[in-house]
Regions:
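N-terminal extension/subdomain marker
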Residues: 21-172
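A short, glycine/acidic-enriched catalytic loop
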Residues: 140-144, 184-217
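C-terminal motif of bacterial Sec signal peptides marking the signal peptidase cleavage site
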Residues: 15-17
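Positively charged n-region of N-terminal signal peptides that target proteins for export
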Residues: 1-4
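Structural recognition of the beta-strand scaffold that forms the well-ordered cores
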Residues: 76-81, 110-115, 176-180, 220-224, ...
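Hydrophobic core
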Residues: 9-13
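Solvent-exposed loop/turn segments at secondary-structure junctions
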Residues: 83-87, 117-121, 182-188, 195-199, ...
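Active-site-proximal C-terminal subdomain of hydrolase catalytic domains
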Residues: 217-263
Length: 263
């Protein structure tokens, strides 16, 4: 098979059937086999992108979250952090919590974190025995809101429902955002690995859908700080629950998102 691939590559170079790629300023493709004018462009927009949102477009008009703007929005970010071996072996959860604590959060933003799912936390005070709920205060500080939120597996959809319910009741807002932090396996296995319950499996897309339906909160976006969760199946599943999906279709590095500048 390798010989076939190599021979095909050599043949392509000799015959010039490959597209030329210019890497000087991004990607630029020139197709020598046929002219671009032969494509049907009847459905393409002739209006240039000016960077301004068009509220009359069919997609933006379908948004379910109302954004007030002018610093009038109250935003509650729910971060569901199942630490797993990413925390116990590599401190990745602790690093990300520190990044969040170092962020400059506006007074109208509530960042609430649910912790659990690992046999060892590297930040003093975070329990490995119980799941807990924290509020990120900024200036390097986090505050424990719920010292004992039970010890259920974080891959259990009921645990996610309980967290969303807690946040929506105690931190009401006109914009809700959910970030699910851990391992991810896309359509195959869904989200999460709870190191304390290695036989509990992961949370499938169907179970995530069930949890979000039961919680009945409309999200501005649902994000997965996890591998392989950006796919059509996940997007379709979330279409009734959120306006946007933020995720990676590729494997992420263990450290995941950089929160200090993004929050």
């Amino acid at each position: 098979m390798k010989k076939i691939i190599i021979l095909f590559a050599i043949f392509s170079l000799l015959t010039g059937c490959c597209a030329k790629t210019n890497y000087d300023k991004g990607f630029s493709f020139n197709y020598s086999s046929q002219s671009n004018s032969s494509y049907n462009t009847s459905s393409w927009s002739t209006t240039s992108n000016n960077g301004v949102l068009n509220p009359n477009s069919s997609y933006s008009s379908q948004k379910k979250t109302t954004i007030l703007g002018n610093n009038k929005d109250v935003v509650t970010i729910m971060l569901y952090m199942c630490g797993s071996d990413l925390e116990s072996q590599a401190m990745m959860g602790s690093y990300d919590l520190q990044e969040m604590a170092n962020a400059k959060l506006a007074s109208n933003v509530n960042l609430i974190v649910y912790t659990g799912g690992t046999t060892k936390w590297h930040i003093d005070g975070i329990s490995t025995r119980y799941n807990q709920i924290y509020k990120v205060l900024g200036s390097g500080q986090i505050k424990c809101l719920v010292d004992n939120a039970g010890s259920a597996a974080m891959t259990n959809s009921d645990t996610l429902v309980d967290f969303i319910d807690y946040c929506s009741i105690n931190f009401p807002a006109n914009r809700y955002e959910l970030i699910m932090w851990d391992h991810g396996a896309g359509t195959v296995s869904g989200y999460g690995y709870d190191e304390k319950y290695p036989n509990s499996g992961s949370m499938s897309l169907a179970q995530i859908d069930q949890a979000l339906t039961e919680a009945n909160v409309q999200f501005d976006f649902v994000g997965f700080d996890a591998c392989l969760m950006a796919n059509l199946e996940t997007a379709i599943m979330l279409s009734e629950h959120a306006d946007y999906l933020i995720a990676s279709e590729e494997s992420e590095p263990g450290i995941g998102w950089y929160y200090t500048s993004s929050l």
